[in-house]
Amino acid sequence: MKAYMYDNQPGDQRLPHDSGRAISTEALGKLGVLYFHFANIADVDRLAADRGYKNRDEITVSPEKMGGMYEDKVKMFFNEHLHEDEEIRYIKGGQGFFDVRSKDDNWVRVRLEKDDLLILPAGIYHRFTTDEANVPVPRIVRTCHEALQGRAQMDAIE
């Protein structure tokens, strides 16, 4: 895992966009974002059970698995959104990026690799993108998992 401030430069979302300003796991924790590294799925299962999770799904984000829907799905995952419940994301292989909003409204990018697990708190704005490889991402959720609209859309409604 590597966390840093997103550079906000234009270009492919699947590139690192590393500003060079590192963010510690302690700073992530202050945002409510928790990081773990579990090489054993039994440890993931135990954490999920301890936190009251009952449901899970897995999605493989790749052109081979998604076919013609791939580009649209990658763009959809990168739309800023939040959930009413906490969620766990565990990377079984490959690499992906989670961007989470900091308290001062900037993006913090968290690069996750195989066996990395991230817990996102309820109500945090976030988005996800793969790198250019195929990434299976099990999503472990407590109950229903509905994405609420992004900040720009929510502001427009109010």
From Swiss-Prot:
Ni(2+) binds at H81, H83, E87, H126. It is found in: Cytoplasm; Nucleus. Binds either 1 Fe or Ni cation per monomer. Iron-binding promotes an acireductone dioxygenase reaction producing 2-keto-4-methylthiobutyrate, while nickel-binding promotes an acireductone dioxygenase reaction producing 3-(methylsulfanyl)propanoate. One of its GO terms (molecular function) is nickel cation binding. Disulfide bonds: none annotated. Keywords: Amino-acid biosynthesis, Cytoplasm, Dioxygenase, Iron, Metal-binding, Methionine biosynthesis, Nickel, Nucleus, Oxidoreductase. Catalyzes 2 different reactions between oxygen and the acireductone 1,2-dihydroxy-3-keto-5-methylthiopentene (DHK-MTPene) depending upon the metal bound in the active site. Fe-containing acireductone dioxygenase (Fe-ARD) produces formate and 2-keto-4-methylthiobutyrate (KMTB), the alpha-ketoacid precursor of methionine in the methionine recycle pathway. Ni-containing acireductone dioxygenase (Ni-ARD) produces methylthiopropionate, carbon monoxide and formate, and does not lie on the methionine recycle pathway. This is Acireductone dioxygenase.
